[in-house]
Amino acid sequence: MTSRERVLLAMNFEYPDRVPVMCQMSIGHMLQQLKDISPVEFWFDAETFANGLIYLRELYQFDGILVSLHGHFKNWREIYNQREVQSDKEIVYLNDRKLIFTNEDLPFPEFYDERKYPSIDEIDISTLPAEIDYIPVSGGLHFKIDLNNKFEVFDLIYQKVGDEFSIHGEVTSPFDYLLDLLGYENALMSLIENPEKCKQILQHFTNGISTLASEMCDKQIDAIKISSPFAGAGFISPEFYKEFVLPYESQIISAIKSKGKFAYLHTCGAINDRLELMIESGTSGLECLDPRPLGDVDLADAKRRLGFKVFIKGNIDSVNTLLFGSPKSVIVDVIDIISIGKTNGGFILSTACSIAPKVPSENIKLLKDLVEKFGRY
């Protein structure tokens, strides 16, 4: 059985030979393993990024590859030509900010002047991009999408791995775009003060993301992850989730599934109070399900509540188990997760959220051995 077949069976609630294993990796963790690669090259260059993902899959013997960035510019060296290399970092200078790159984390944007966010009333929806041309990665960090070269990275990966491994794409929730547009505090206040305008903005981004996801489905991928890290209890109530997240992510999921691909939601932190709401979206699967103390999900309870409605991808604690744990404690925790997760199928072993930058690679290498020994059906 190929790795791809294994993942497809798990996502479809059929029984593979064993539990598949496939983790999302933080950019920092990737770069920690790719010692000789410039973090700037890894971020901006499609071929460097693709080759890095392929190498890391081989290093950890994962059954699939998640492609979290797409739309690289072929002429990125000309666009980002103001570049400084220092002993411990690289800096790319842009018009309004500089991006500081290290091999330990995401690029860090440092604005020359204090960043000022528009108020909800100042937003003219007609001026927002009709076509999604950026990914709001984190805290003012955008990854620009070349609209003439949106999906080259998928072709580069598929040319080298073929149908052997499951390739997954990624898009970002409309809720993230709203938060990025207005700033976190301003956006959360706007949900209360001007909910209808927020919904208009959310629908605008939903239209663009649905189109982007639908186009992505034409590539050689099996699933698309919808990154929605701010939709947990740490940010919004279940009531606001139902009003400002669920209707919009549901549309994107519908667009993906209409193309014959799987869709799964990635929401960090505490989601125990909204598991049933999340599956109302029609999602094929849920990723993360962070255990305490990072979140509040008990895997056995989640399996009972979710039943055969969605597959689960999770839920190893990347910090307390993989980063701070000993190899012995990692083994104990992961065996327990495999035992619970594999019950009735529909399970992919993964970290709850991404592999933290400083997690020892030896701990990640244990995962393949553990599913081989304890994850057999």
Each model region followed by its residue ranges:
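Short, charge-rich binding segments
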Residues: 56-59, 81-85, 157-160
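Short, glycine/charge-rich beta-strand/loop segments that flank catalytic centers
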Residues: 67-81, 173-175
